[in-house]
């Protein structure tokens, strides 16, 4: 074969080979992108789906009881004040519950309760959206047995200093009950559901910080510096 022809043929083969490699790479990238997109926009894969559904229902109901607990502390207010800073302002009332006068006498506790109420309303809506978009589930918040028991105690606790202390201890316990499931969420949810991962990470941080804020209040204001929150699971509470 003439050398010029041989060189030309070789170049054509090299170009063809490179195009084939690039084409296969692009196909592979497309398949990965499609697979990733399907997982990100759809239900969890394998066992992650069951975990995600159970977790999202749990956190919706958990936060729902927190709304009422925080209302008892801060009070409800159907006519919100336009002022940014108003220590007497209450929260928006939860459907199904009557308007409530604030039982906490400490401005710091009422402020914390208002903030928790607003944050957890948003987190309930986000969890409902995950359930609806990924699993076609419409879940309305419900009070768990644990939540009902806590509300019964807070309802019967006299307003003022006694309520302040009871609320701080009980709301700390309530926060703690969301920590372990949310830590599990970080390693059991579908790895393509980055939005849920960030959601669970944020709950871990905010609940943990909230617990320690309340422990500091108990220590500073009521000399209860040895308080340890509990989940109600005696085995875990005694050993961990």
List the predicted regions and their residue ranges.
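N-terminal secretory signal peptides
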Residues: 1-16, 25-33
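A periodicity- and composition-biased signal for non-globular, repetitive helical segments
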Residues: 9, 24-25, 30, 69, ...
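A short, ordered amphipathic alpha-helix with a cationic face
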Residues: 16-18, 171-172
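Sec/Tat signal peptide C-region and signal peptidase I cleavage site
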Residues: 36-39
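All-alpha RGS (Regulator of G-protein Signaling) helical domain and cognate RGS-like helical scaffolds
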Residues: 41-240
């Amino acid at each position: 074969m003439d050398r010029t022809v041989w060189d030309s043929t070789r170049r054509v083969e090299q170009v063809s080979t490179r195009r084939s490699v690039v084409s296969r790479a692009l196909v592979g990238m497309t398949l990965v992108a499609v697979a990733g997109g399907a997982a990100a926009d759809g239900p969890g894969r394998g066992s992650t789906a069951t975990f995600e559904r159970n977790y999202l229902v749990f956190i919706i109901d958990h936060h729902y009881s927190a709304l009422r607990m925080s209302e008892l502390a801060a009070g409800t207010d159907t006519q919100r004040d336009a002022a940014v800073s108003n220590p007497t302002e209450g929260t928006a009332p939860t459907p199904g519950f009557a308007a409530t006068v604030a039982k906490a006498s400490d401005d710091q506790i009422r402020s914390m309760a208002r903030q928790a109420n607003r944050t957890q309303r948003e987190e309930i809506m986000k969890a409902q959206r995950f359930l609806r978009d990924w699993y076609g589930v419409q879940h309305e918040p419900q009070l768990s047995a644990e939540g009902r028991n806590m509300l019964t105690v807070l309802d019967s606790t006299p307003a003022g200093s006694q309520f302040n202390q009871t609320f701080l201890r009980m709301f700390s316990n309530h926060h703690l009950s969301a920590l372990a499931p949310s830590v599990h969420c970080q390693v059991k949810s579908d790895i393509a559901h980055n939005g849920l991962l960030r959601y669970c990470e944020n709950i871990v941080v905010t609940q943990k910080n909230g617990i320690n804020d309340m422990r500091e209040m108990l220590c500073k204001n009521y000399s209860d510096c040895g308080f340890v929150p509990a989940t109600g699971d005696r085995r875990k509470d005694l050993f961990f």
